[in-house]
Protein backbone atom coordinates (compact mmCIF):
# COMPACT_ATOMS: atom_id res chain seq x y z
CA UNK A 1 0.00 0.00 0.00
CA UNK A 2 1.55 3.39 -0.97
CA UNK A 3 2.13 6.02 1.74
CA UNK A 4 -0.95 8.21 2.35
CA UNK A 5 0.39 11.78 2.59
CA UNK A 6 -3.11 13.18 3.17
CA UNK A 7 -4.49 10.79 5.79
CA UNK A 8 -4.57 13.41 8.56
CA UNK A 9 -6.68 15.81 6.53
CA UNK A 10 -9.09 13.55 4.64
CA UNK A 11 -11.98 14.60 6.93
CA UNK A 12 -11.62 18.29 6.11
CA UNK A 13 -9.93 18.25 2.68
CA UNK A 14 -13.12 18.80 0.61
CA UNK A 15 -14.50 21.56 2.81
CA UNK A 16 -11.19 23.44 2.55
CA UNK A 17 -10.52 23.10 -1.17
CA UNK A 18 -14.12 23.59 -2.29
CA UNK A 19 -14.07 27.04 -0.73
CA UNK A 20 -10.77 27.87 -2.36
CA UNK A 21 -11.09 26.57 -5.86
CA UNK A 22 -13.52 26.78 -8.75
CA UNK A 23 -13.30 23.22 -10.05
CA UNK A 24 -16.01 23.87 -12.66
CA UNK A 25 -13.93 26.66 -14.23
CA UNK A 26 -10.79 24.46 -14.24
CA UNK A 27 -12.78 21.55 -15.77
CA UNK A 28 -14.15 23.84 -18.50
CA UNK A 29 -10.67 25.08 -19.46
CA UNK A 30 -9.12 21.63 -19.23
CA UNK A 31 -11.65 19.82 -21.45
CA UNK A 32 -10.96 22.43 -24.08
CA UNK A 33 -7.36 21.15 -24.11
CA UNK A 34 -8.54 17.50 -24.28
CA UNK A 35 -9.85 18.03 -27.85
CA UNK A 36 -11.27 14.72 -29.06
CA UNK A 37 -9.05 12.60 -26.80
CA UNK A 38 -11.04 9.99 -24.90
CA UNK A 39 -8.82 7.98 -22.54
CA UNK A 40 -7.72 10.27 -19.75
CA UNK A 41 -5.52 9.63 -16.69
CA UNK A 42 -5.71 11.85 -13.58
CA UNK A 43 -2.44 11.58 -11.63
CA UNK A 44 -3.32 12.30 -7.99
CA UNK A 45 -7.13 12.44 -8.33
CA UNK A 46 -7.65 13.04 -4.59
CA UNK A 47 -11.36 13.13 -3.65
CA UNK A 48 -12.40 13.44 -7.31
CA UNK A 49 -13.76 17.01 -7.14
CA UNK A 50 -12.30 18.00 -10.52
CA UNK A 51 -13.28 14.77 -12.28
CA UNK A 52 -16.85 15.16 -10.94
CA UNK A 53 -17.06 18.42 -12.91
CA UNK A 54 -15.31 16.99 -15.99
CA UNK A 55 -17.74 14.08 -16.34
CA UNK A 56 -20.73 16.38 -15.96
CA UNK A 57 -19.44 18.33 -18.96
CA UNK A 58 -18.10 15.33 -20.96
CA UNK A 59 -19.83 12.13 -19.70
CA UNK A 60 -18.48 10.08 -22.62
CA UNK A 61 -14.83 10.39 -21.48
CA UNK A 62 -13.11 7.29 -20.08
CA UNK A 63 -11.32 8.57 -17.00
CA UNK A 64 -8.93 6.66 -14.77
CA UNK A 65 -7.65 8.14 -11.52
CA UNK A 66 -4.64 7.08 -9.47
CA UNK A 67 -3.72 8.28 -6.01
CA UNK A 68 -1.54 7.17 -3.12
CA UNK A 69 -4.18 8.21 -0.54
CA UNK A 70 -6.64 5.41 0.27
CA UNK A 71 -8.59 7.83 2.49
CA UNK A 72 -9.12 10.43 -0.28
CA UNK A 73 -9.81 7.71 -2.87
CA UNK A 74 -12.63 6.37 -0.68
CA UNK A 75 -14.32 9.76 -0.99
CA UNK A 76 -13.62 9.81 -4.76
CA UNK A 77 -15.33 6.41 -5.02
CA UNK A 78 -18.42 7.73 -3.21
CA UNK A 79 -18.52 10.84 -5.37
CA UNK A 80 -17.82 9.23 -8.77
CA UNK A 81 -19.29 5.74 -8.37
CA UNK A 82 -18.47 3.37 -11.21
CA UNK A 83 -18.10 6.07 -13.86
CA UNK A 84 -14.37 6.42 -13.18
CA UNK A 85 -11.76 3.72 -12.79
CA UNK A 86 -9.85 4.32 -9.52
CA UNK A 87 -6.52 2.78 -8.43
CA UNK A 88 -4.54 3.21 -5.24
CA UNK A 89 -1.08 3.44 -6.85
CA UNK A 90 2.01 5.58 -6.61
CA UNK A 91 2.71 7.10 -10.05
CA UNK A 92 6.39 6.22 -9.45
CA UNK A 93 5.38 2.54 -9.82
CA UNK A 94 2.45 3.06 -12.17
CA UNK A 95 1.25 -0.18 -13.72
CA UNK A 96 -2.15 -0.03 -15.37
CA UNK A 97 -3.49 -2.41 -17.93
CA UNK A 98 -4.38 0.45 -20.24
CA UNK A 99 -2.89 3.14 -22.48
CA UNK A 100 -4.04 6.77 -22.44
CA UNK A 101 -4.41 9.66 -24.89
CA UNK A 102 -3.75 12.17 -22.16
CA UNK A 103 -2.61 12.36 -18.54
CA UNK A 104 -2.82 15.39 -16.29
CA UNK A 105 -1.99 16.45 -12.76
CA UNK A 106 -3.96 19.23 -11.06
CA UNK A 107 -2.14 19.71 -7.79
CA UNK A 108 -1.69 15.93 -7.82
CA UNK A 109 1.71 14.22 -7.89
CA UNK A 110 3.14 17.43 -9.35
CA UNK A 111 2.10 21.05 -10.04
CA UNK A 112 3.86 24.13 -11.27
CA UNK A 113 3.99 27.10 -8.91
CA UNK A 114 5.00 30.68 -9.59
CA UNK A 115 7.76 31.84 -7.28
CA UNK A 116 8.21 35.52 -8.13
CA UNK A 117 9.58 35.44 -11.67
CA UNK A 118 10.50 31.76 -11.54
CA UNK A 119 8.35 28.79 -12.49
CA UNK A 120 9.04 25.79 -10.28
CA UNK A 121 7.72 22.26 -10.22
CA UNK A 122 6.33 21.39 -6.78
CA UNK A 123 6.46 17.62 -6.51
CA UNK A 124 4.93 15.40 -3.83
CA UNK A 125 7.59 12.89 -4.89
CA UNK A 126 10.77 14.00 -3.15
CA UNK A 127 13.59 11.89 -4.56
CA UNK A 128 14.99 13.06 -7.91
CA UNK A 129 15.35 9.54 -9.35
CA UNK A 130 11.80 8.77 -8.25
CA UNK A 131 10.51 11.94 -9.98
CA UNK A 132 12.32 10.84 -13.15
CA UNK A 133 10.77 7.39 -12.81
CA UNK A 134 7.29 8.89 -12.35
CA UNK A 135 7.70 10.75 -15.67
CA UNK A 136 8.92 7.55 -17.33
CA UNK A 137 5.91 5.60 -15.97
CA UNK A 138 3.44 8.18 -17.29
CA UNK A 139 5.16 8.30 -20.69
CA UNK A 140 5.00 4.48 -20.83
CA UNK A 141 1.20 4.68 -20.40
CA UNK A 142 0.70 7.29 -23.15
CA UNK A 143 -0.05 6.39 -26.74
CA UNK A 144 2.16 7.91 -29.45
CA UNK A 145 1.49 11.66 -29.57
CA UNK A 146 -0.30 11.38 -26.24
CA UNK A 147 -0.04 14.37 -23.93
CA UNK A 148 0.83 15.16 -20.35
CA UNK A 149 -0.60 18.36 -18.86
CA UNK A 150 0.85 19.70 -15.60
CA UNK A 151 -1.41 22.43 -14.28
CA UNK A 152 -0.17 25.48 -12.36
CA UNK A 153 -1.47 25.99 -8.85
CA UNK A 154 -1.28 28.54 -6.06
CA UNK A 155 -0.34 25.89 -3.46
CA UNK A 156 2.65 28.03 -2.45
CA UNK A 157 0.40 30.67 -0.84
CA UNK A 158 -1.18 30.55 2.62
CA UNK A 159 -4.98 30.56 3.08
CA UNK A 160 -7.41 30.83 5.97
CA UNK A 161 -11.13 30.14 5.73
CA UNK A 162 -13.84 30.44 8.39
CA UNK A 163 -16.51 27.90 7.63
CA UNK A 164 -19.40 28.68 9.97
CA UNK A 165 -18.01 30.65 12.88
CA UNK A 166 -17.00 27.38 14.57
CA UNK A 167 -14.67 25.74 12.09
CA UNK A 168 -11.56 27.30 10.56
CA UNK A 169 -9.33 25.80 7.87
CA UNK A 170 -5.87 27.10 7.32
CA UNK A 171 -2.90 26.39 5.04
CA UNK A 172 0.43 27.88 6.00
CA UNK A 173 3.37 27.66 3.66
CA UNK A 174 7.08 27.89 4.29
CA UNK A 175 10.22 27.07 2.32
CA UNK A 176 13.09 24.95 3.46
CA UNK A 177 16.51 24.37 1.92
CA UNK A 178 18.20 21.06 2.65
CA UNK A 179 21.59 20.22 1.13
CA UNK A 180 21.14 22.78 -1.64
CA UNK A 181 17.66 21.54 -2.59
CA UNK A 182 14.47 23.56 -2.04
CA UNK A 183 11.26 22.26 -0.45
CA UNK A 184 7.80 23.68 0.18
CA UNK A 185 6.34 22.84 3.56
CA UNK A 186 2.53 22.97 3.61
CA UNK A 187 0.77 22.79 6.97
CA UNK A 188 -2.98 22.21 6.80
CA UNK A 189 -4.84 22.79 10.08
CA UNK A 190 -8.49 22.56 11.03
CA UNK A 191 -9.70 24.27 14.24
CA UNK A 192 -13.12 23.86 15.86
CA UNK A 193 -14.05 26.47 18.49
CA UNK A 194 -10.36 27.37 18.76
CA UNK A 195 -9.20 23.78 19.35
CA UNK A 196 -7.03 21.96 16.81
CA UNK A 197 -8.98 18.99 15.37
CA UNK A 198 -6.80 18.10 12.38
CA UNK A 199 -3.26 18.76 11.16
CA UNK A 200 -1.38 17.45 8.15
CA UNK A 201 2.09 18.47 7.01
CA UNK A 202 2.96 17.91 3.35
CA UNK A 203 6.47 18.43 1.98
CA UNK A 204 7.07 19.08 -1.72
CA UNK A 205 10.34 19.16 -3.66
CA UNK A 206 10.90 22.25 -5.79
CA UNK A 207 12.64 21.96 -9.16
CA UNK A 208 13.41 24.54 -11.84
CA UNK A 209 11.28 24.39 -14.96
CA UNK A 210 14.36 23.88 -17.20
CA UNK A 211 15.53 20.92 -15.16
CA UNK A 212 12.03 19.37 -15.23
CA UNK A 213 11.75 19.82 -18.98
CA UNK A 214 15.13 18.09 -19.48
CA UNK A 215 13.84 15.18 -17.39
CA UNK A 216 10.65 15.04 -19.46
CA UNK A 217 12.58 15.13 -22.76
CA UNK A 218 14.64 12.17 -21.46
CA UNK A 219 11.42 10.10 -21.44
CA UNK A 220 10.25 11.37 -24.83
CA UNK A 221 7.93 14.16 -23.63
CA UNK A 222 8.63 17.49 -25.37
CA UNK A 223 7.01 20.80 -24.44
CA UNK A 224 4.42 22.02 -26.95
CA UNK A 225 2.73 24.84 -25.03
CA UNK A 226 2.39 26.47 -21.62
CA UNK A 227 -0.89 28.40 -22.05
CA UNK A 228 0.45 31.51 -20.31
CA UNK A 229 2.06 29.35 -17.63
CA UNK A 230 -1.31 27.89 -16.65
CA UNK A 231 -1.30 24.54 -18.44
CA UNK A 232 2.13 23.11 -19.31
CA UNK A 233 1.58 20.63 -22.13
CA UNK A 234 4.07 17.90 -23.16
CA UNK A 235 3.68 15.52 -26.08
CA UNK A 236 5.05 12.03 -26.57
CA UNK A 237 7.00 11.53 -29.77
CA UNK A 238 5.30 9.23 -32.29
CA UNK A 239 7.20 6.03 -33.23
CA UNK A 240 9.20 6.51 -36.44
C1 LIG B 1 -3.47 18.54 -3.17
S1 LIG B 1 -4.14 16.97 -3.51
C2 LIG B 1 -4.98 17.32 -5.05
C3 LIG B 1 -6.09 16.35 -5.37
C4 LIG B 1 -6.89 16.65 -6.63
N1 LIG B 1 -6.06 16.55 -7.83
C5 LIG B 1 -7.58 17.99 -6.56
O1 LIG B 1 -7.39 18.80 -7.47
O2 LIG B 1 -8.35 18.24 -5.62
C6 LIG B 1 -2.71 16.02 -4.03
C7 LIG B 1 -3.05 14.59 -4.33
O3 LIG B 1 -1.95 13.96 -4.98
C8 LIG B 1 -1.80 12.66 -4.43
N2 LIG B 1 -0.42 12.18 -4.67
C9 LIG B 1 0.71 12.68 -4.11
N3 LIG B 1 1.79 11.99 -4.53
C10 LIG B 1 1.33 11.02 -5.38
C11 LIG B 1 1.97 10.00 -6.12
N4 LIG B 1 3.29 9.83 -6.05
N5 LIG B 1 1.21 9.18 -6.90
C12 LIG B 1 -0.14 9.36 -6.94
N6 LIG B 1 -0.81 10.33 -6.25
C13 LIG B 1 -0.08 11.16 -5.48
C14 LIG B 1 -2.14 12.86 -2.96
O4 LIG B 1 -2.42 11.68 -2.28
C15 LIG B 1 -3.33 13.81 -3.07
O5 LIG B 1 -4.55 13.13 -3.19
Feature annotation, model-predicted:
Residues 1-35, 37-46, 49:
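Conserved class I S-adenosyl-L-methionine
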Residues 49-93:
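Class I SAM-dependent methyltransferase SAM/SAH-binding core
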Residues 124-144:
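A short glycine-rich, Lys/Arg-flanked "PGG" loop and its adjoining helix->strand segment in the class I
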Residues 111-130:
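Mobile active-site "lid"/loop adjacent to the S-adenosyl-L-methionine
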Residues 95-103:
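A short acidic, Gly/Pro-enriched loop at the edge of an enzyme's catalytic core
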Residues 147-215:
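SAM-dependent methyltransferase
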Residues 211, 215-240:
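C-terminal lobe and adjacent flexible extensions of AdoMet/dcAdoMet transferase-like proteins
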Amino acid sequence: MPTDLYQGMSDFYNAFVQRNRDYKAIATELIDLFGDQQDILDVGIGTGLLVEQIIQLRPELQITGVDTSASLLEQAQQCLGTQVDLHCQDVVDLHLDKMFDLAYSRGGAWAFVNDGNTILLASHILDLDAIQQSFERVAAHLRDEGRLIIISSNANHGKREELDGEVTFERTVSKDGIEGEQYLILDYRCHRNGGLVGHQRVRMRLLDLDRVEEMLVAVGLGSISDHHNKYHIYQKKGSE
